[in-house]
């Protein structure tokens, strides 16, 4: 199902994006004086478009570096109209450009996220910023909630002060009783960070944004599961160096690696699970998972990012987008 209309939002574009979009029949909106990046650009576009739409209409918002699956719109529209979902978000898959490097590791990570969404019957915790279909009545409800003081924000659809506008928008919607879903078939392929440096800044922004959103909303029935998830994640991060320390100490004391059948089968089960959850990615994804060590190093890297984000949040350091 094709979109009824395509609008390209150009924010400080210096290339031929606007001309190319218009040549394909898209409507082009240029931002004016935008200082709030993606959230500000989308807010300007929505302020222009929403007044002319009916409550029964829907708006698809997606990143420029994202390609939709052929049936994305049809599946998403059906989910919104039949299930009353606030929004239908993308199940994003990575466009890997290497076999065992940074982009391949992100590919496996995204494959596991897609598997987890399938296991949870499409129940989404966050509507991905890569692509999401939103019913107009829900977007208007968000604006009214912000203007009426029920929600944080400045009276627009997207908060202007959140590092992760998609995360914050999902939280706002859930506080108003809306639901979110990412059903099978609503997949997209998106670009990923090509280097560790750019990945570091991206994930630092994501995690800092998630923590800041929880701080802004406080402890409520809606945020409680998110708080619990964050606490458990950080406990797991703290346990990892303790586990490694115990093993190293045992090797030093005994001169051999500590061995036990329970630990062997537990480790084997973990490896099988990690391989099984990326099987949709083909042979390269399976080989990377079987190697184990690259993904362990990747996990340690992310642990450092999460700890850095928590430290920045506790110190209340400036929140801003970083670019390598």
Q: What label would you give each PLM region?
A:
Residues 194-242:
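Active-site-adjacent helix/loop segment of glycosyltransferases
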Residues 52-67:
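Short beta-strand-to-loop acidic/aromatic patch adjacent to the donor-nucleotide binding site
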């Amino acid at each position: 199902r094709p979109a009824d209309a395509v609008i390209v939002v150009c924010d400080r574009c210096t290339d031929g994006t606007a001309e190319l979009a218009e040549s394909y029949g898209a409507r082009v909106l240029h931002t004016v004086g935008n200082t709030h990046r993606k959230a500000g650009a989308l807010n300007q576009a929505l302020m222009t478009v929403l007044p002319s739409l009916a409550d029964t209409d829907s708006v698809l918002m997606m990143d420029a570096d994202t390609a939709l699956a052929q049936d994305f719109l049809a599946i998403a529209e059906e989910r919104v109209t039949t299930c009353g979902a606030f929004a239908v978000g993308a199940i994003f898959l990575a466009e890997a450009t290497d076999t065992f490097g940074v982009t391949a590791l992100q590919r496996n990570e995204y494959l596991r996220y897609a598997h987890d969404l399938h296991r949870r019957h499409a129940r989404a915790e966050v509507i991905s910023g890569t692509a999401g279909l939103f019913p107009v009545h829900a977007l208007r409800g968000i604006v009214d909630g912000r203007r009426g003081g029920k929600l944080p924000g400045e009276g627009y659809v997207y908060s202007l002060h959140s590092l992760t506008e998609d995360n914050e928008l999902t939280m706002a919607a859930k506080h108003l009783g809306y639901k979110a879903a990412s059903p099978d078939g609503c997949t997209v392929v998106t670009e990923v960070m090509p280097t560790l440096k750019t990945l570091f800044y991206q994930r630092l922004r994501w995690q800092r944004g998630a923590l800041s959103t929880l701080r802004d909303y406080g402890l409520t029935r809606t945020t409680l599961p998110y708080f619990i998830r964050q606490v458990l994640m950080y406990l797991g991060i703290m346990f990892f160096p303790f586990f490694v320390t115990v093993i190293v100490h045992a090797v030093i004391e005994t001169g051999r690696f500590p061995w036990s059948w329970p630990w062997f089968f537990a480790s084997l089960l973990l490896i099988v699970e990690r391989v099984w959850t990326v099987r949709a990615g083909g042979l390269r994804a399976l080989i990377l998972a079987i190697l184990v060590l690259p993904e362990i190093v990747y996990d340690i890297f992310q642990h450092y990012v999460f700890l850095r984000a928590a430290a920045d949040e506790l110190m209340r350091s400036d929140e801003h987008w970083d670019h390598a």
